[in-house]
């Protein structure tokens, strides 16, 4: 740790700022209930293995929380309700001259996990900059208020995701304004709709290059499965190849066109995005689907993003240990085909939800960046807070 200690602050090891509580009993899945009053938390940041009906091991509340540290994952949690723990989850409480909410914030930035191993010995030796107690409380209050915004924004995102899934299911089975329905291989659908194999809606389906491509600081973007997420292609972080390699080493199957739909077939399966930039290429982890005149790009994207088709693709994925989506299977998948005008109407409805979703996601990203900046300033004393 840097020896640049702000005036009035001091350097302490972690165990000088908190007390590790004795765990009266360690739980596992055989000692907990599926439901109950008190969670038994695991080594993640937000889940539990089950519940206790009576006699929690640790009592806390909103005004007197307890912080926990997970030995293997380094996950830090602030518990505000009574709870129990599994093995290797260590409950901590503040000492007399430290604030528990401040401890939570500095431990969140304490150490990075180095694989699945015990990290508490390293935490015990870690040194932290500690301001006077009133300043701790003020810093913790500022950071906690930002945490609250982040948590509420995540809840908004969850609600919008649920709304989108429900709306997709409604629109892709009942359409808009229909009164006449018929039975089909995919259940009841509007009478004017068809059920076809996916390939009947495409002029082309393939996947990208398999041989290594030279990398360059400038040139054409190489999109892989990790660059496709939440309906967006992450051009900013995609690697690049030289213009010469793009032209000479690749065929058209690796060079998608604007309006093509990308589908991740390896890694995290089933993520989709519509190509909106020329001059990019894809590797073998990404499939390209080129719609014909019978289906719009955005309808194809929305349809394949819906819960039913996502589940179908994942259920049909092959491979023993590592799963893959095979285009020879996907292209035979049965899909609905509404008339083009109704495809556009469905896309319009879903686009409005997508716009809301994008706005909230940007807010989350901006707030997380703000939190990171505040922590760098406030937890180092670079920016001092005024204490009343």
Residue ranges and their predicted role:
Residues 269-276:
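Short, Lys/Arg- and Gly-enriched loop/turn segments at beta-strand edges
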Residues 13-64, 80-87, 199-212, 226-258:
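Sequence-specific dsDNA recognition surfaces
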Residues 1-8, 131-179, 183-186, 336-388:
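Amphipathic alpha-helical coiled-coil/heptad-repeat segments
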Residues 1-25, 36-46, 133, 180-207, ...:
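Non-catalytic DNA-recognition/assembly elements of restriction-modification systems
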Residues 43, 145, 263-264, 352:
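A generic structural signal for residues embedded in beta-strands
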């Amino acid at each position: 740790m840097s020896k640049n200690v702000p005036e009035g602050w001091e350097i302490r090891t972690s165990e000088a700022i908190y007390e590790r509580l004795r765990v009266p009993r360690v739980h596992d899945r055989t000692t907990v209930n599926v439901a109950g009053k008190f969670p038994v938390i695991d080594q993640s940041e937000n889940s539990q293995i089950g519940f206790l009906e009576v006699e929690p091991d640790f009592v806390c509340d909103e005004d007197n929380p307890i912080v926990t540290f997970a030995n293997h994952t380094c996950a830090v949690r602030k518990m505000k309700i009574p709870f129990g723990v599994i093995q290797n989850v260590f409950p901590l409480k503040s000492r007399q001259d430290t604030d528990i909410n401040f401890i939570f914030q500095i431990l969140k930035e304490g150490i990075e996990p180095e694989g699945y191993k015990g990290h508490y010995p390293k935490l015990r030796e870690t040194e932290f900059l500690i301001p006077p107690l009133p300043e701790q409380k003020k810093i913790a209050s500022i950071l906690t208020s930002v945490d609250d915004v982040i948590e509420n924004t995540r809840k908004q995102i969850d609600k919008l995701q649920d709304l989108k899934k429900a709306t997709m299911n409604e629109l892709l089975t009942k359409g808009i304004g229909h009164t006449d329905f018929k039975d089909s291989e995919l259940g009841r659908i509007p009478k004017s709709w068809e059920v076809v194999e996916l390939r009947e809606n495409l002029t082309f389906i393939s996947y990208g290059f398999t041989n290594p491509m030279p990398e360059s600081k400038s040139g054409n973007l190489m999109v892989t499965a990790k660059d496709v997420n939440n309906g967006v292609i992450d051009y900013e972080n995609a690697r690049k190849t030289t213009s010469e390699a793009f032209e000479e080493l690749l065929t058209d199957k690796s060079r998608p066109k604007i309006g093509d739909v990308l589908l991740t077939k390896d890694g995290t399966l089933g993520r989709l995005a519509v190509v909106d930039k020329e001059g990019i290429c894809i590797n073998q982890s990404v499939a390209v689907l080129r719609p014909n005149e019978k289906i719009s790009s955005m309808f194809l994207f929305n349809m394949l993003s819906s819960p039913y088709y996502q589940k179908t693709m994942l259920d049909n994925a092959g491979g023993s240990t590592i799963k893959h989506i095979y285009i020879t299977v996907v292209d035979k998948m049965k899909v609905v085909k509404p008339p083009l005008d109704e495809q556009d109407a469905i896309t319009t409805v879903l686009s409005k939800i997508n716009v809301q979703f994008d706005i909230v996601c940007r807010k989350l990203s901006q707030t997380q960046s703000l939190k990171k900046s505040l922590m760098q300033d406030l937890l180092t004393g670079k920016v001092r807070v005024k204490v009343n």
